[in-house]
């Protein structure tokens, strides 16, 4: 792993990487609520430098290194990659960290694991606004925080009701509630905390 970590550290420390981080942060994402015909699209446009940084992180396994190297100091390597890349640009690290940390939840549900893990384990950055099933790589975000509870997850009020009398892991649920905050809304799927 030392060679990979050294390579990523070298890339993260380049002047070019810091320049891209500067441009990505100077040019905030912009919501494009409608297309030119007035149809609702709710797309988020990012500066090209942001996409370059996302590609750099994903192509170097900053989001999934631990899962490609389980039992071989993979999580330690994941921590090192996270630390090094955070020095260059912290905003990119949010979708990286969420995608990394969602894996145990995905693995608890075989059908969902089979559907999502191959694309989550991909090292391809695919920013296209298309269905996740058509993408070469995905990112997974999280909806946890609610106004009344902040980071106290015990006080959440969002609840899940099974659809079509199917209950349990892997079933479909109707979610009702209000999440106050979402990092990285351009992710392809979301883990949502509900009762």
Predicted regions and their residues:
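Extended, charge-enriched "interface" segments that sit outside catalytic cores
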Residues: 1-71
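Internal helix-loop-helix
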Residues: 40-131, 183-184
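Short, hydrophobic/aliphatic alpha-helical segments
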Residues: 75-84, 163-169, 174
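Hydrophobic residues within well-ordered, non-membrane alpha-helices that form the packing/core
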Residues: 105-106, 144, 194
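Internal maturation/activation junctions in enzymes
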Residues: 112-163, 168-171
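A short core secondary-structure module
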Residues: 170-195
